[in-house]
């Protein structure tokens, strides 16, 4: 999962922690479980923080799925 990072955040309007996934310091998305039924949702931030042209936003699908799975597993492990 080279280039990816997971940061846990606590937006003021959220009841629980969320996980932000970045690639080469460019934020990609945030995963949260704010729904009443506890289902994870993903919100993409395609223009939240634009870096220079040296950051190529292209990576393997398998690596992205691994980091999304890891973020969801980490969020499940956090006590409510």
Which residues does each predicted region cover?
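Terminal leader/tail segments of proteins
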Residues: 1-80
């Amino acid at each position: 999962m080279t280039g990816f990072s997971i940061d846990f955040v606590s937006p003021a309007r959220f009841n629980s922690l969320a996980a932000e996934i970045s690639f080469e310091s460019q934020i990609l998305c945030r995963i949260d479980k704010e729904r009443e039924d506890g289902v994870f949702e993903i919100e993409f931030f395609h223009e939240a923080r634009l870096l220079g042209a040296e950051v190529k936003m292209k990576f393997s699908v398998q690596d992205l799925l691994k980091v999304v799975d890891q973020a969801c597993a980490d969020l499940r492990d956090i006590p409510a």
